From Swiss-Prot:
InterPro entries: Chaperonin_Cpn60_CS, Cpn60/GroEL, Cpn60/GroEL/TCP-1, GroEL-like_apical_dom_sf, GROEL-like_equatorial_sf, TCP-1-like_intermed_sf. This is Chaperonin GroEL 1. GO terms for cellular component: cytoplasm. The gene is groEL1. GO terms for biological process: protein refolding. Forms a cylinder of 14 subunits composed of two heptameric rings stacked back-to-back. Interacts with the co-chaperonin GroES. GO terms for molecular function: ATP binding; ATP-dependent protein folding chaperone; isomerase activity; unfolded protein binding. It catalyses: ATP + H2O + a folded polypeptide = ADP + phosphate + an unfolded polypeptide. Signal peptide: none annotated. Belongs to the chaperonin (HSP60) family. Together with its co-chaperonin GroES, plays an essential role in assisting protein folding. The GroEL-GroES system forms a nano-cage that allows encapsulation of the non-native substrate proteins and provides a physical environment optimized to promote and accelerate protein folding.
Length: 561
């Protein structure tokens, strides 16, 4: 495959054109009065969105050099989304401004390496400043962060705040599409495993077709049980104690399952059995989680424990257990809080060391189940187009809220970046040469871009707003909704510090890379050939008729031998 190779300023200008095309489409969505973008879909109705990352991912340009520039901005947006969950439009606007100013200076003769160094030093200083000014988030502020990120939707803010309150910051909150028109919150308390009862004969509530136990013993084992002799000692001990029993095992089959069903039917013992969740090593880890949560032990031959050795103290206790045909939910107080915390810390360490997105997701689920619950926000809307847009907004709001809990909050609406620009002047005195100072100035000017864009999108002159905000106190900024200058923290217009930090770091990183690019190598697109002449083509096919002569080489010819 042939390649196109471009050098020097020409290569950088090609990248800039692609960057500007994508960034201009993304920036119009910024702020509470941001405009919508309509995306054509190959199949189905067009999608109307107000979400920067969705717009960015959907753009592919015809010119391969420009498309490479667009991909760089997609990378900025995606990286910011991965780290902080929100702030993709802010990162895009910052990167576009830094690249534009930087390329002007490089074209005028500035040393791109020194300029890049100046950008990196300035961004590093500003990141420390953001961490210094961030305030911890609590109470009402959680709902306010979610409301701002959801485009001013107070109902979404309240729902996310309620979900975080119920499942804690370690819990899992998921967003799903609902078949109804309303948006609702469902919270599952305790640990839920995706395994239901092994036999419908275990059901205790015939109307709801569920098994309900209270203060039941839980036998947890990684063994496959097929002989009833393995279970007899356990069943006798539980029956004498007058308690219900839940058995979680790799599998229970044949004689063992049949005997449990008969005992349940005769009223000898209130019992139910479910298969262990997961597979392989993950299954053992999840069984150990259940054991720690319920205050029991995992009965495994690997640690020298067999079913004959089990007594009541080795079993867990479930304060409330509910089992349907698909899921088992255990609410337990049996485990000590200290042991559960240790287990969560251990899983969190594994989470930090893992490179696999799938493994990370499963480890996060395990933390949530140990921490106390899963909340599901079911999103409803009148049309599919509105539903998709609303779901994207809620996901953004949820990610922003998690980021705020992690690293705290700062005044929103681009205000923090404006006030931080004064720190750049202080830094310039410590920089080694004039070209590094140019890098610092590039960042300082870029810090104005987010507020400028938010104001422009709301129909007011951005440059006027920027100058006015620059002269106010740190927490005072421009409220686009009311058109007033006020204390944004008091007004509930907040940004997660992690979002602002990640947007700035990723924008600075990509700007430095573009400025120091001296050559771009891309694949040369294949020219689409002209449509073939149908008459000529068909005539050629006619020649295939000669193949009919091959018949003469067949069996009759062989007869001549």
């Amino acid at each position: 495959m042939a390649k196109i190779v471009e050098f020097d300023d020409k290569s950088r200008r090609s990248l800039e054109r692609g960057i500007n095309t994508l960034a201009d489409a993304v920036r119009i969505t910024m702020g509470p009065k941001g405009r919508n973008v309509l995306l054509e879909k190959k199949y189905g109705a067009p999608q109307i969105v107000n979400d920067g990352i969705t717009v960015a991912k959907d753009i592919e340009l015809e010119d391969p050099l420009e498309n490479t520039g667009a991909k760089l901005i997609q990378e900025v947006a995606s990286k910011t989304k991965d780290i902080a969950g929100d702030g993709t439009t802010t990162a895009t606007v910052l990167a576009q401004s830094m690249i534009k100013e930087g390329l002007k200076n490089v074209a005028a003769g500035a040393n791109p390496v020194a300029v890049r160094r100046g950008i990196e030093k300035t961004v590093s200083l500003l990141v420390k400043e953001i961490q210094t000014v961030a305030k911890p988030v609590e109470g009402e502020a959680i709902a306010q962060v979610a409301t701002v990120s959801a485009g001013g939707d107070a109902e979404v803010g309240r729902m996310i705040s309620e979900a975080m309150d119920k499942v804690t910051k370690d819990g899992v909150i998921t967003v799903e599409e609902s078949k109804s028109l309303s948006t609702d919150l469902e919270v599952v308390e305790g640990m839920q495993i995706d395994r239901g009862y092994l036999s419908p004969y275990f059901v205790t509530d015939q109307e709801r077709l569920v098994v309900d136990f209270e203060n039941a013993r839980i036998l947890i084992t990684d063994k496959k049980i097929s002989s009833i002799q393995d279970l007899v000692p356990v069943l006798e001990k539980v029956a004498r104690a007058g308690q219900s029993l839940l058995i979680i095992a790799e599998d229970i089959e044949g004689e063992a399952l049949a005997t449990l069903v008969v005992n349940k039917a005769r009223g000898v013992l209130n019992v139910a059995a479910v298969k262990a969740p997961g597979f392989g090593d993950r299954r053992k880890a999840m069984l150990q989680d259940i054991a720690i949560l319920t205050g029991g032990q995992l009965i495994s031959e690997e640690v020298g424990l067999s079913l004959e050795m089990v007594d009541l103290d080795m079993m867990g206790i479930g304060r409330k257990i509910s089992i349907n045909k698909d899921n088992t939910t255990i609410v337990a107080d049996g485990g000590t809080a200290e042991e559960v915390k240790k287990r969560i810390a251990q899983i969190r360490k594994q989470l930090g060391e893992s490179d696999s997105d799938y493994d990370k997701e499963k480890l996060q689920e395990r933390i949530a189940k140990l921490a106390g619950g899963v909340a599901v926000i079911k999103v409803g809307a009148a049309t599919e187009t509105e539903l998709k847009d609303r779901k994207l907004r809620i996901e953004d709001a949820l990610n922003a809220t998690k980021a705020a809990v992690e690293e705290g909050i700062v005044p929103g609406g681009g205000t923090t970046l404006i006030h931080l620009s004064t720190k750049v002047e202080e830094l310039k005195g410590s920089l080694n040469n004039e070209e590094e100072k140019i890098g610092a100035d590039i960042v300082r000017r870029a810090l104005e871009a987010p507020l400028n864009q938010i104001a422009n999108n709301s129909g007011v002159e951005g440059s006027v707003i920027v100058e006015k905000v620059r002269s106010t106190d740190f927490s005072v900024g421009y409220n686009v909704i009311t058109g007033e200058y006020e204390d944004l923290i008091a007004a509930g217009i907040l940004d997660p510090a992690m979002v602002v930090r990640s947007a700035l770091q990723n924008a600075g990183s990509i700007a430095g890379m573009v400025l120091t690019t001296e050559a771009v190598v891309v694949e040369k697109p294949e020219k689409k050939g002209a449509a073939p002449d149908m008459d000529g083509g068909m005539g050629g096919m006619g020649g295939m008729g000669g193949m009919g002569g091959m018949g003469g080489m067949g069996m009759p010819g062989m007869g001549m031998m």
